Structures are given as structure tokens and as C-alpha cells.
């Protein structure tokens, strides 16, 4: 956290998301432990309904997102599908060289669903 171009992007994206979807619980920039760990969330953002209970994590760029999802996948033994790229004119998917057949299948389903939207 702190002042940087990435933090500015997250602040701007948060404002846009809140304007477009006021019905969603959205908080702005916070460190992962604050977003994920209830005790840390209560300590750092006591008035937030999201801190410590976040279910969606938005990263400021592809590299940061890639690092985050690979850590979760490899250390946490979580199923990770992605990265899922948004905001382009057509669906685009990117697969790691370490992807297996199931990864390709699942990301293909997501890409096909994006194409139908």
C-alpha cells in the first residue's frame, strides 16, 4: 500500500465499479491479508463489510494477478483458472506453459461463455 501508479489505478477502478454496481459490496485498495483474514480485516478496516471476508481479489496488473493465483494454486492447493482478461473487444485467454489438459478445457469454457455475452 502507499502512493503509486498501481494504487491510483485500483482507486479509480473501485470508483467506476461502485458507480456501475452500487448493489455490490466493494471496498477499495487493501493488502491481501486485510482482505482475506477476518482478524486483520477487523483491525485495519473495522467499518468494512468486505475486509476479512472478500471473495473476489482484483490485482492492478496481469503480472501481479499471475503471481497471486499461482501462489494460491501451488501452495494452497486451490483450483486456479485463468488469467481471465476483461475489457477487450473479443475474448482472449492466456495459458501457462505449465497448464494441463483440464486447465485448457476449463479456460476454453470460460472463453466461450465470454464470446456469447
Language model feature labels by segment:
Residues 1-29, 33:
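Glycine-rich phosphate/diphosphate-binding loop of Rossmann-like nucleotide-binding domains
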Residues 1-8, 38-41, 68-72, 105-106:
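Short acidic, glycine/serine/threonine-rich loops at helix termini
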Residues 9-10, 42-44, 76-77:
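Charged helix-capping and loop-helix junction motifs
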Residues 12, 16, 38, 68, ...:
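C-terminal functional extensions of proteins
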Residues 24-27, 55-57, 82-83, 90-93:
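Structural motif
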Residues 29-32, 62-63, 97-98:
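Short, ordered loop/turn segments at secondary-structure junctions
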Residues 31, 41-51:
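A structured beta-alpha segment of the ubiquitous adenosine-cofactor-binding alpha/beta core
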Residues 50-57, 61-76, 80-84:
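A C-terminal functional module that forms or caps the active site or interfaces directly
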Amino acid at each position: 500500500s502507499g502512493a503509486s501508479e498501481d494504487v491510483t489505478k485500483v482507486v479509480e477502478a473501485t470508483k467506476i465499479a461502485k458507480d456501475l454496481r452500487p448493489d455490490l459490496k466493494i471496498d477499495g485498495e487493501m493488502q491481501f491479508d486485510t482482505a482475506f483474514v477476518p482478524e486483520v480485516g477487523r483491525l485495519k478496516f473495522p467499518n468494512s463489510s468486505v475486509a476479512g471476508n472478500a471473495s473476489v481479489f482484483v490485482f492492478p496488473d496481469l503480472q501481479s494477478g499471475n503471481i497471486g493465483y499461482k501462489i494460491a494454486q501451488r501452495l494452497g492447493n486451490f483450483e486456479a483458472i485463468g488469467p481471465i482478461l476483461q475489457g477487450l473487444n473479443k475474448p482472449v485467454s492466456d495459458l501457462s506453459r505449465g497448464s494441463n489438459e483440464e486447465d485448457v478445457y476449463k479456460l476454453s469454457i470460460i472463453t466461450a461463455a465470454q464470446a456469447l455475452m
